[in-house]
């Protein structure tokens, strides 16, 4: 599991702690999004973030970054990070198995958004979902950008917490990102990533 390959197997042996199988036939099955999407979002209330992780995993996110942002109501100290990561990873693993994913998305925590700037070279596209763009009626940037996505492209999508992204945080990526609105309505922090993933799935999987 987690190498994006599916095999028809025959059980060869079962013990108390493992199952040995013989590989019989490789299966032509792919349940992964054509593009690699990392969801970077500000910390939000625990139940909402866990729901986001579950649903975004079902919708095809490849990895998650939880970030303590300027307007995050929830704060996470170092003593709690390890236990939180363990719980989040368990939720992600269960959602991946339930939705027949071929990979288990990863998750990490960063104490501020500046640390993400050091990783921008890892991505082909960086998109920032900004509610002010929606208020101003911006409707085309997201559509135009996702139409450019090619198979295996790596996409980083950044979402704010309940209070949204600050102008300072937006400015960190001013020269490297595309700021997008997600339709004419203002979405909740836990809903916006799901909207984006659904749009990507529709464009790259259903429209082909």
Give the positions of each predicted feature:
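Structured adenosyl-cofactor binding patch, chiefly the S-adenosyl-L-methionine
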Residues: 166-208
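Fold-independent oxyanion-binding glycine-rich loops
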Residues: 2, 43, 110, 130-132, ...
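Short connector loops at helix/strand junctions that flank enzyme active sites
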Residues: 4-6, 16-18, 32-36, 59, ...
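Short, glycine- and charge-enriched coil/turn segments that flank and shape catalytic ligand pockets
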Residues: 14-18, 28-31, 78-79, 118-125, ...
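Generic structural signal for helix capping and beta-alpha/helix-loop junctions
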Residues: 73-74, 136, 189, 196
């Amino acid at each position: 599991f987690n190498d994006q390959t599916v095999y028809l197997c025959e059980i060869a042996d079962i013990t108390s702690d493992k199952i040995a199988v013989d590989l019989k036939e490789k299966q032509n099955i792919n349940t992964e999004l054509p593009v690699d999407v990392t969801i970077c979002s500000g910390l939000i209330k625990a139940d909402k973030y866990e729901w986001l992780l579950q649903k975004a995993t079902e919708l095809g996110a490849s990895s998650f970054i939880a970030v303590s942002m300027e307007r995050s109501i929830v704060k996470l100290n170092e003593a709690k990070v390890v236990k939180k990561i363990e719980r989040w990873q368990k939720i992600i693993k269960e959602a991946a198995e339930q939705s027949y994913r071929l990979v288990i998305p990863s998750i990490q925590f960063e104490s501020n958004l500046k640390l993400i700037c050091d990783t921008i070279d890892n991505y082909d596209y960086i998109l920032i979902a900004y509610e002010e763009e929606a208020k101003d009626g911006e409707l085309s940037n997201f559509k135009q950008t996702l139409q450019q996505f090619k198979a295996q492209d790596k996409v980083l999508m950044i979402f704010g917490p309940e209070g949204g992204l600050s102008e300072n945080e937006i400015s960190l990526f001013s020269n490297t990102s595309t700021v997008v609105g997600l339709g004419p309505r203002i979405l909740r922090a836990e809903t916006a990533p799901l909207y984006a993933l659904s749009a990507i799935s529709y464009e790259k999987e259903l429209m082909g």
